[in-house]
UniProtKB/Swiss-Prot annotation:
This is NADH-ubiquinone oxidoreductase chain 4L. The chain crosses the membrane at residues 1-21, 29-49, 59-79. PANTHER family: NADH-UBIQUINONE OXIDOREDUCTASE CHAIN 4L, NADH-UBIQUINONE OXIDOREDUCTASE SUBUNIT ND4L. It comes from Sminthopsis crassicaudata (Fat-tailed dunnart). Its EC number is 7.1.1.2. The gene is MT-ND4L. Keywords: Electron transport, Membrane, Mitochondrion, Mitochondrion inner membrane, NAD, Respiratory chain, Translocase, Transmembrane, Transmembrane helix, Transport, Ubiquinone.
Length: 98
């Protein structure tokens, strides 16, 4: 069980580093955020089943719902930004120009 938890924590940290490194493109940032949410979901599910905390069994599903909402809003923003600016480079966006 320890090696699985360690692998999931490493996956979360790699996705976090991906967000920090590839923050110039919106699509790369969204993919790294999805990786972070997926590793958190799996880690939370494993910890709940390992420690027999069945009263918290709805928490991973709530996290998954928020992750899906975050992905939908992020993709809608990506489509809108790509349509108006022609690329998903974050540094080319000027928020005062709307």
């Amino acid at each position: 069980m320890l090696s699985i938890n360690l692998n999931l924590i490493v996956a979360f940290l790699l996705a976090l580093m991906g967000v920090l490194i590839y923050r110039s493109h919106l699509m790369s940032t969204l993919l790294c955020l999805e990786g972070m949410m997926l590793s958190l979901f799996i880690l939370m599910t494993l910890l709940i089943t390992h420690f027999h905390m069945f009263s918290m069994s709805m928490t991973p599903l709530i996290l998954l719902v928020f992750s899906a909402c975050e992905a939908a809003i992020g993709l809608a923003l990506l489509v809108k930004i790509s349509a108006t600016h022609g690329s998903d480079h974050i540094q080319n966006l000027n928020l005062l120009q709307c």
